[in-house]
Amino acid sequence: MADAATITKLEEGFKKLEAATDCKSLLKKYLTKSVFDQLKAKKTSLGATLLDVIQSGVENLDSGVGVYAPDAEAYTLFSPLFDPIIEDYHKGFKQTDKHPNKDFGDVNQFVNVDPDGKFVISTRVRCGRSMEGYPFNPCLTEAQYKEMESKVSSTLSNLEGELKGTYHALTGMTKDVQQKLIDDHFLFKEGDRFLQAANACRYWPTGRGIYHNDNKTFLVWCNEEDHLRIISMQMGGDLGQVYRRLVTAVNDIEKRVPFSHHDRLGFLTFCPTNLGTTVRASVHIKLPKLAANRDKLEEVAGKYSLQVRGTRGEHTEAEGGVYDISNKRRMGLTEFQAVKEMQDGILELIKIEKEMQ
């Protein structure tokens, strides 16, 4: 049972949400009085309550989603809130649906989407993973952060071939290394106000770090928003090469570190928007003609379930007609299907851009 102080805070938070008529978050939409009453006293075995789930969305009324999972059990215990939010965000992933088993498919189906190098500046595929047996950020202790980091760094130090590289702990990092990682756009900063409010940045920078291979085409973030963010990237449009590298790495790491997986929801992550495959495949792409015809761009993007963002990611503008375009769907389809959908969409965008020139 949640304690009285927590329940009081929850009641206040619920009142604040109810009063916020211009709040458009999925939290506000689905945290009805009956769902609230059903969940307010519940507590996971690691001690997480509904307050841990909703506090970021209560503090930041401009959130798009507004909920985070403090631990893996939260997705089950607080499912009357999570399930409708998941269904709404991952369009069409119904509460009776089951995410398919992991399937990276035939990696040779992926190609260089821009062999002439005229449109695509860079290509990146990432996934998120949580380590089994550990809660997510808000419930982690300082000792757990350290323990996880040592498991991750020793696991990664065994990677070979193209993936061989160096682990840099954020704790005690020298200014030189820090600057170098910033210049390479590798360094992650302490969380934004949404993550701060979710208590995702405690004991910072303990247990946080960055691994990269010698070529700087493979990157692992340890204990940023998720336990692990595994990233493969390079300049140009060779999606095939980027995808193959990621798949090799994930399969290798998985042999040594068991990941949290849910029968219905797939791979578990801190934020429900990343569940399922957790895969985000993206390109930075120059589309000057389509940029001038935003409706056409959005129409094609919609057809292939692509998300169009500004150059520097979420909530930014396109600089010089350069967009960050990625797959939108992560749940209810396989890893292969998610990336294939993105490849098909990018090829179509390039074809249309060429026709408009």
UniProtKB/Swiss-Prot annotation:
Gene3D superfamilies for the chain: ATP:guanido phosphotransferase, N-terminal domain, Glutamine synthetase/guanido kinase, catalytic domain
PROSITE patterns per record: PHOSPHAGEN_KINASE, PHOSPHAGEN_KINASE_C, PHOSPHAGEN_KINASE_N
Keyword flag Lipid biosynthesis: no
Protein keywords: Acetylation, ATP-binding, Kinase, Nucleotide-binding, Transferase
Enzyme Commission (EC) number: 2.7.3.3
Enzyme class name: transferase
Gene Ontology BP term (one): phosphocreatine biosynthetic process
Recorded superkingdom: Eukaryota
Catalytic reaction list: L-arginine + ATP = N(omega)-phospho-L-arginine + ADP + H(+)
GO terms assigned for molecular function: arginine kinase activity; ATP binding; creatine kinase activity
Annotated positions binding ATP: 122-126, 185, 229, 280-284, 309-314
Domain Phosphagen kinase N-terminal: 9-91
Residues recorded as bearing N-acetylalanine in the entry: 2
Any one GO cellular component localisation term in the record: extracellular space
Domain called Phosphagen kinase C-terminal: residue spans: 119-356
Binding-site residues, L-arginine: 64-68, 225, 271, 314
ATP-binding recorded as keyword: yes
InterPro entries xref list: ATP-guanido_PTrfase, ATP-guanido_PTrfase_AS, ATP-guanido_PTrfase_cat, ATP-guanido_PTrfase_N, ATP-guanido_PTrfase_N_sf, Gln_synth/guanido_kin_cat_dom
Family of this protein: Belongs to the ATP:guanido phosphotransferase family.
UniProt-recorded name of the protein: Arginine kinase
Annotated organism of origin: Carcinus maenas (Common shore crab)
